[in-house]
Amino acid sequence: MQEVAANKPREKAGAHTMARYGFQVHASILKILEVHRTGADYRAVFDHFDDLMMLDRSEQPEKVGFFQIKSQDKGEWTLAALTAKKGKSKPATFLGRLYHHMDAFGVMVSCLGFVSNLGFKLKLIDGTETTADNLVIPSSQLHPDVMAVLRGAVAKDGVGNTAVDGSQLFVFERIGLGLIEQDKFVKGALVEFIHEREDAHYIPVISLYETLRGSVFTKSGVTEEFTTEAEFYDRKTLSRADVETMFLRATSGRRFLDNWGTIAGDLTANGMRSRRMIVLKNSCILYIKARSVGEPGATAFNAAARDIIIAHQTEIDSYETLPEIVAQLEKWLPSDYEHREGALYVESFEAIG
């Protein structure tokens, strides 16, 4: 992974348009959800070497899939369109750019995926042509004549002479994501995904969508080269654990607000008046939102609070009310974080149980 982080990426995100980003970001989220629901470990890498890389492990990966994510207003992807030259730089074709990764990654490559909102018009091994029902078309289903054209195209593109033949790794995929109302489509996919989880009741879909979209969008836009693996992971990737953390943060924030009535009862018994309570609740909400989107101050406070809570869990478990826990956490955790008071209450609430 150190070589991947330090290597100069082929894709440079700053040169691409916002319109392209919209489809690419949303398609990347859908691919993340697809892999995440299998239970497998992974690390997604955005706009580094290609539109999307999917590593089979978050640490020390053995396999990597590459994806070109392309959107069009109308039509379908024919063999001629897939092998047509785009621009003057080499490799000049979509498939050549995908196959180019065989040079650098060889046997590590598990998939060379071409993902689009449009369908494909390709000849299948039985002599028939693909239809709208063919959503995922691996190379193994394509006619030998088509495979010969694909191999010839990447050879002309100057990337066909690799030590490992990657032509059988091509996969052509049509996804349901369109060019309009992409946010609604992905939110719908999130709803389906969340319903499969035990904590579904507590996860706010819109908040989770905004967090995922914002994270993928930001990481796609980073164009620098990296000197450390840790920096690369932080700025350009999302792992399974990272996405789970997003779910947990969204869940815990919802649970805190759902239990505000109980919390308010403790605060009232402790002598807090309504005006003061409203200010506190707003501070809690601001902290929950800041933490859910990965705001540095909020994540730093969260990390520090987690360490202290783990170190003092036995003592924390001995307290009967939330204000008692807050009072102790305030002593243990000196900080000038702007939403400190709300953060103390949220972290203290999550420390219970």
Language-model segments: which ranges?
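Acidic metal-coordinating catalytic centers involved in nucleic-acid phosphodiester chemistry
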Residues: 1-17, 70-347
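Catalytic centers of nucleases
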Residues: 14-18, 24-85
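Generic transmembrane alpha-helix signature in multi-pass membrane proteins
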Residues: 351-352
